[in-house]
């Protein structure tokens, strides 16, 4: 059997920027084991397999695999796959359209934004609003994990804390971008400190303007490390940025629609831009949205024998 696939760069408008993604747009007939082996063979952060929907309201069903395991939800695969499907199976007419994507976390609404008939970007709305639980390890231990001094970690209002919109992340705010660039991640410390914990993906953050609190910044820099998923460092992490919406929301007092740009991937030479929107009212958070652009890179076939 031959299965067609495409590769894209996600959360960028530049070839060879952003986060690479492989998508199999017609994955019917593949077993769970084959999907996992294919994801390990391609060895991107994630590989997506598209299947027919199983609900009345779903447009497509996505299965998302890292080199090590399947995920309930992931941002850059959702954003990039929707972009690809918008090219392969465009809506008619070519106007802004929202599809419902079936993922293990639930139905994920994704909006395809068109401008003058051209697909510009895609934007997901999380199926699961941010949740938080578990206390974070001490700042002393986290400084050791990152190869930093403890005074390079923020404390107080912006202390480390874990959130999830389907995939948990431990957020560690640092004092500035210089500290972020100096990270020397220690996998051995991670193994002893976080392996097997609810949030074992580590997302480090730095304010664009260190004179302002993280939630008051419009620009936030980030780096994400996920040894448990087989990802040493990720160039762009949509599910992490979605969960970040919960971290920032808990530190915001003003209702309304709040927007941030998250820049990630610089340390890997793959700069990425992710747009985060949090909508809240007097009762709390109402919606979290993550948007970005994608670039189609290549297409090919994988031969799996008879």
UniProtKB/Swiss-Prot annotation:
One of its GO terms (biological process) is biosynthetic process. Gene3D superfamilies: Diaminopimelate Epimerase, Chain A, domain 1 (3.10.310.10). It holds the Pfam family PhzC-PhzF. Disulfide bonds: none annotated. The active site is at 46. One of its GO terms (cellular component) is cytoplasm. It comes from the Bacteria. Transmembrane segments: none annotated. Its EC number is 5.1.-.-. The keyword Glycoprotein does not apply. GO terms for molecular function: isomerase activity. InterPro entries: Phenazine_PhzF-like. Keywords: Isomerase. NCBIfam families: PhzF_family (TIGR00654). Belongs to the PhzF family. This is Uncharacterized isomerase slr1019. It comes from Synechocystis sp. (strain ATCC 27184 / PCC 6803 / Kazusa).
């Amino acid at each position: 059997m031959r299965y067609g696939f495409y590769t894209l760069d996600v959360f960028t408008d530049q070839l060879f920027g952003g986060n690479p993604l492989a998508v199999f747009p017609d994955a019917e007939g593949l077993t769970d084991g084959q999907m996992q082996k294919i994801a390990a063979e391609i060895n991107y952060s994630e590989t997506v397999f598209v299947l027919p929907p199983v609900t009345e309201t779903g447009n497509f069903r996505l299965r998302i695999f890292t080199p090590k395991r399947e995920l309930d939800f992931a941002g850059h695969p959702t954003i990039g796959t929707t972009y690809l499907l918008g090219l392969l199976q465009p809506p008619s007419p070519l106007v802004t359209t929202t599809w419902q994507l079936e993922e293990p976390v639930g139905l994920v609404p994704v909006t395809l934004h068109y401008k003058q008939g051209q697909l510009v970007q895609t934007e997901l709305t999380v199926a699961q609003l941010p949740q938080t639980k578990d206390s974070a390890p001490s700042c002393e231990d986290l400084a050791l994990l990152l190869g930093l001094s403890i005074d390079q970690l923020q404390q107080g209002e912006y202390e480390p804390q874990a959130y999830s919109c389907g995939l948990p992340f431990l957020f560690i705010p640092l004092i500035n971008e210089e500290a972020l660039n100096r990270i020397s991640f220690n996998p051995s410390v991670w193994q002893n400190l976080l392996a097997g914990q609810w949030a074992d993906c580590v997302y480090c953050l730095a304010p664009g303007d260190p004179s302002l609190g993280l939630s008051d910044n419009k620009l936030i820099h980030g780096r994400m490390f996920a040894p448990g998923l087989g990802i040493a460092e990720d160039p762009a992490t949509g599910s992490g940025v979605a969960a970040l919406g919960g971290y920032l929301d808990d530190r915001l007092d003003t209702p309304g629609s709040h927007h941030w740009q998250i820049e990630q991937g610089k340390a890997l030479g793959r700069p990425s831009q992710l747009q985060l929107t949090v909508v809240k009212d007097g009762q709390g958070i109402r919606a979290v949205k993550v948007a970005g652009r994608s670039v189609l890179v290549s297409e090919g076939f994988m031969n799996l024998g008879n």
